Amino acid sequence: MKEGIHPNYREVVFQDMSNGFKFITRSTIQTRENIELDGKTYPLAKIEVSSESHSFYTGQQKIMDTAGRVEKFKNKFGVRASGKAK
């Protein structure tokens, strides 16, 4: 393998900006900011959504009312879609 062509794979802190949750994982992401955590300095990557804030993982999912949407569509376009003229 060639030397010097691979990105630096290191520990990085990812911070969820919606709730402040931080976790350390390994990544090759390039960052401009650093953060001190547990007495060590790590590169900081700010993210909008993580497993701590995503509705799928938190159990606060919104169930879409597809039946209501279909009824709304039929009420709006039902006459034209069925081929009947007024």
Curated annotation (Swiss-Prot):
CC per GO annotation: ribonucleoprotein complex; ribosome
S-S pairs: none
MF term (GO), any: structural constituent of ribosome
SUPFAM superfamilies xref list: L28p-like
Keywords recorded for this protein, A-Z: Ribonucleoprotein, Ribosomal protein
GO biological process, one term: translation
Pfam families: Ribosomal_L31
InterPro entries: Ribosomal_bL28/bL31-like_sf (IPR034704), Ribosomal_bL31 (IPR002150), Ribosomal_bL31_B (IPR027493), Ribosomal_bL31_sf (IPR042105)
Record family assignment: Belongs to the bacterial ribosomal protein bL31 family. Type B subfamily.
Subunit details: Part of the 50S ribosomal subunit.
HAMAP family assigned: Ribosomal_bL31_2
Protein name as it appears in the record: Large ribosomal subunit protein bL31B
Gene name per UniProt: rpmE2
